């Protein structure tokens, strides 16, 4: 008689193997499903956001350093307080629209700390100039409104560094390599579209220009032409009323405005824009001739705003040229004793800017309720040209 165990075991063994294999497969599949995959690395923020964040961090660092210098008596607080106010307004302007978006490390550095390494007055001036140069450089690449904000921030920091060096008696920072002369190279050109019914002529436009160049860019170029034409007219009207010590610089500035007007007209032509006719005259502000110096400064500040508009809507060589022209206009405004504001080229309503976190009650924290405008002298001593005697 056959043993039943010997007959059934061989048949059960494959079945057991199948059960074990199926169980292992289920366990493995559940394990892969429960173990989350690695999250992809976050995408790098766009250049404009990185440039804005860097500008904010440096403004806060400089602000903290200025407060430290003033608190330790290493420099005259009366000289440093306007700079701290300037940096405070700039930092508030650089904050992202989203509340609390400033980097935590940057905001933490805004408060002077006993553990922070001391900085000398000369080092502070050099750091301010370095930050201004970096902002101007980034403005040539950043997008639209951020570019305008960076250009104005950098221009104001460079001006403040120069004036602060004079006030503190420390070496003046070396001028940035970027200037009107080095930034005004011509754009690569392509033929402009010919008017309907006419053969295509030799006129040229920048690559991406002509019909492809945004209308707001051509409009901003036309506005720059108008601003320069008005500046030329203003200088011609003011020259006979200026003191001899002011007439020399005014003549140089007049020549520069004529060059800028011609350059703006050429860029507008290359952009296939409609030429701006030369006006026979302009209506000057009441009292312009009675106080020609300060009113020339206001004209320069207005020109800076026109170039700020162009910075926001242009690219490439036009952008670089506009950034440089904005800097120069702000500098000339200061030469005439007019403060172009904390962000030249951009009208700021400081009351609408977000407050810096943790700034309540801090000296220099909130800044003035309104930004120093083109017609005011708030801020560092301008060290302008000699005053003009009252016109008879």
Q: Over which residues does each language-model region extend?
A:
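All-alpha RGS (Regulator of G-protein Signaling) helical domain and cognate RGS-like helical scaffolds
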Residues: 2-392
């Amino acid at each position: 008689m056959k043993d039943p165990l010997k007959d059934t075991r061989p048949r059960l063994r494959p079945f057991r193997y199948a059960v074990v294999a199926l169980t292992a497969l289920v366990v493995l599949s559940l394990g892969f499903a429960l173990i989350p995959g690695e999250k992809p690395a976050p995408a790098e923020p766009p250049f404009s956001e990185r440039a804005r964040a860097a500008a904010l961090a440096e403004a806060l660092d400089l602000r903290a350093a200025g407060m430290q210098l003033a608190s330790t008596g290493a420099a005259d607080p009366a000289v440093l307080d306007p700079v701290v106010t300037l940096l405070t307004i700039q930092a508030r302007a650089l904050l992202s629209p989203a509340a609390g978006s400033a980097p935590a490390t940057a905001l933490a550095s805004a408060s002077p700390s006993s553990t922070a390494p001391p900085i000398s007055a000369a080092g502070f001036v050099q750091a301010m100039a370095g930050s201004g140069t970096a902002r101007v450089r980034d403005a040539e690449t950043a997008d639209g409104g951020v570019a305008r904000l960076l250009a104005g921030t950098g221009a104001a920091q460079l001006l403040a560094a120069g004036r602060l060096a004079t006030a503190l008696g420390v070496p003046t920072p070396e001028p940035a390599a970027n200037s009107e002369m080095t930034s005004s190279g011509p754009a690569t050109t392509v033929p402009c579209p010919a008017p309907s019914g006419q053969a295509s002529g030799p006129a040229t436009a920048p690559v991406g220009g002509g019909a492809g160049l945004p209308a707001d860019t051509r409009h901003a170029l036309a506005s720059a032409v108008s601003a320069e034409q008005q500046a030329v007219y203003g200088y011609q009207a003011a020259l006979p009323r200026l003191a001899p010590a002011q007439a020399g610089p005014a003549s140089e500035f007049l020549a520069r405005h004529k060059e800028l007007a011609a350059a703006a007209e050429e860029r507008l032509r290359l952009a296939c824009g409609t030429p701006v006719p030369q006006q026979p005259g302009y209506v000057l502000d009441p009292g312009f001739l009675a106080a020609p110096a300060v009113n020339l400064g206001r004209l320069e500040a207005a020109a800076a705003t026109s170039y700020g508009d162009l910075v926001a809507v242009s690219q490439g060589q036009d952008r670089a040229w506009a950034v440089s022209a904005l800097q120069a206009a702000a500098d000339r405004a200061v030469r005439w004793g007019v403060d172009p504001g904390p962000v030249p080229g951009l009208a700021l309503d400081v009351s609408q800017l977000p407050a810096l976190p943790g700034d309540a009650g801090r000296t220099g924290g909130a800044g003035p309720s309104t930004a120093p405008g083109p017609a005011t002298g708030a801020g560092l001593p301008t060290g302008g040209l000699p005053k003009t005697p009252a016109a008879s």
